[in-house]
Curated annotation (Swiss-Prot):
A single cellular component GO annotation: cytoplasm
Binding annotation for L-serine: T228, A229, E230, E282, S382
Pathway info: Aminoacyl-tRNA biosynthesis; selenocysteinyl-tRNA(Sec) biosynthesis; L-seryl-tRNA(Sec) from L-serine and tRNA(Sec): step 1/1
Pfam short name (any one): tRNA-synt_2b
Main location: cytoplasm
Reaction equation(s) it catalyzes: tRNA(Ser) + L-serine + ATP = L-seryl-tRNA(Ser) + AMP + diphosphate + H(+); tRNA(Sec) + L-serine + ATP = L-seryl-tRNA(Sec) + AMP + diphosphate + H(+)
This protein's UniProt keywords: Aminoacyl-tRNA synthetase, ATP-binding, Cytoplasm, Ligase, Nucleotide-binding, Protein biosynthesis
Domain characteristics, as noted in the entry: Consists of two distinct domains, a catalytic core and a N-terminal extension that is involved in tRNA binding.
Subunit structure: Homodimer. The tRNA molecule binds across the dimer.
Protein name: Serine--tRNA ligase
Binding site for ATP: R259, S260, E261, E346, I347, A348, S349
Biological process according to GO: selenocysteine biosynthetic process; seryl-tRNA aminoacylation
Coiled coil stretches, renumbered: none
Biological source species: Rickettsia rickettsii (strain Sheila Smith)
């Protein structure tokens, strides 16, 4: 959520930043609603003061009867009725909060202006792409290996699900352990095993609700399946005040993630790129405003390390204003090279959310010896999605005979297996 005080003091800049997100100017409407709310709040405070004064007089009166006493009683009763009505109006007029909840984060000064991915800015590349490399797509390879099943899975769960078998299931498990080991041992992230069912307020805190309600799976009893472990991890500090010396806090978690993929009809209809259920290793950092820019580079580099160790070509893109996520003020996308598609595809998003999530979930820190609190900054990064990493391995490590060479760093995690070959039942 955005800071209403900042909007109040920076109306023109607020409208300018909204326009960069392709949203019409809203400062005038917010000023009107904010003014009404502040007026009601001021009236409530005045009436509360008047009630306190009159109640004190009543309490000090020697005679608890008579015209003056009864008149003061009537005044207090009248004030209470007014207060009840005003407090009802204040509590039930949610238009201002509903409007604020729909605004995305304000873009950082470094974020390029643009409407879509075509305006994203290349930051760096890693590795060489080979235009003459073998170019079967991952699902062709997986099906031929008899280790990737879409057809039977569709009978169980419908489309956008997959069943992995044998050595591909083993590769999935190996990748999870490998990624967690790298992030905990080399990058100082603390491993968490969080819930995948969360309450709506946890989704709201992370910026998933109310705007993206249709993109998640809701249960019948007030819970939602997480679209990313970011939701569970950032809420680890909700409604807390953290001592400054404990920052940064860095969490890593592997979870299953669930997305309805509303609005993605027609895209990536085959294979493992876009699924309703997928495994992902997620990174979250909690830090101070002064350190969040450096922490953004840190968490991005942690994600990149996985691809470097797997020797997979990739590039890092700085997202433009029109392509950036709702809660982010600055995002790097990491895109891995897929020979089967002959293009780079997103494999990780690494975002600095500033105090946007922290304001929603009241996550603060304070210096030692001080009573003053400040909102933390939250950051997140994919570290990485298991399915898309497997896609990249299958396509970049495929052989003429359809077998898949195991990347060197995974051989020990695969129990010494160096190559995946077709499975014969």
């Amino acid at each position: 959520m955005l800071n209403i005080k900042w909007i109040r003091e920076n109306k023109e800049l607020f409208d300018e930043k909204l326009s960069q997100r392709f949203i019409e100017p809203m400062s005038s409407k917010i000023a009107m609603l904010d003014g009404e709310k502040r007026k009601i709040t001021s009236l409530i405070q005045e009436l509360q003061h008047a009630r306190k004064v009159k109640s004190k007089i009543l309490g000090n009166m020697a005679s608890k009867s008579g015209e003056e006493f009864e008149g003061l009683q009537r005044d207090v009763k009248h004030i209470n009725e007014k207060l009840e009505a005003l407090e009802h109006d204040l509590n039930n007029n949610n238009e201002l909060n509903e409007l604020l909840n729909m605004f995305p984060n304000i873009p950082d000064e470094e974020v390029p202006y643009g409407m879509d991915a075509s305006m994203n800015k290349l930051v760096r590349t890693y590795g060489e792409t080979n235009p003459n490399a073998l170019n079967k797509q991952h699902f062709e390879l997986g099906i031929k290996l008899n280790l990737m099943d879409f057809e039977q899975t569709a009978k169980i769960s419908g489309t956008k699900f997959v069943t992995l078998k044998g050595d591909l299931a083993k590769l999935e498990r190996a990748l999870i352990n490998f990624m967690i080991d790298v992030h905990t041992k080399e990058w100082d992230f603390f491993e968490i095993s969080p819930p995948v069912l969360v309450r709506d307020n946890a989704m709201y805190n992370a910026g998933q609700l109310p705007k993206f309600a249709e993109e998640s799976f809701a249960t019948t009893n007030g819970y939602r399946l997480i679209p990313t472990a970011e939701v569970s991890l950032v809420n680890m500090v909700a409604d807390t005040i953290i001592p400054r010396e404990k920052l940064p806090i860095r969490y890593v978690a592997y979870t299953q993630c669930f997305r309805s993929e509303a609005g993605s009809s027609g895209r990536d209809t085959r294979g493992m790129i876009r699924l309703h259920q997928f495994g992902k290793v997620e990174l979250v950092s909690i830090t101070t405003p002064e350190e969040s820019t450096n922490e953004h580079e840190y968490i991005t580099n942690a994600s990149e390390t996985i691809l470097q160790k797997l020797n997979l070509p990739y590039r890092v893109m700085l997202l433009c204003t029109g392509d950036m996520g709702f809660a982010a003020k600055k995002t790097y996308d990491i895109e891995v090279w897929l020979p089967g598609q002959k293009q780079y595809r997103e494999i990780a998003s690494c975002s600095n959310c500033g105090d946007f999530q922290a304001r929603r979930m009241k996550a603060r820190y304070k210096e030692f010896g001080s009573n003053e609190t400040t909102l933390v900054h939250t950051l997140n990064a994919s570290g990485l999605p298991i399915g898309r990493t497997m896609v990249a391995i299958l396509e970049n490590y495929q052989n003429e005979d359809g077998s898949i060479t195991i990347p060197d760093v995974l051989i020990n995690y695969m129990g010494g297996l160096q190559k995946i070959i077709a499975y014969s039942e």
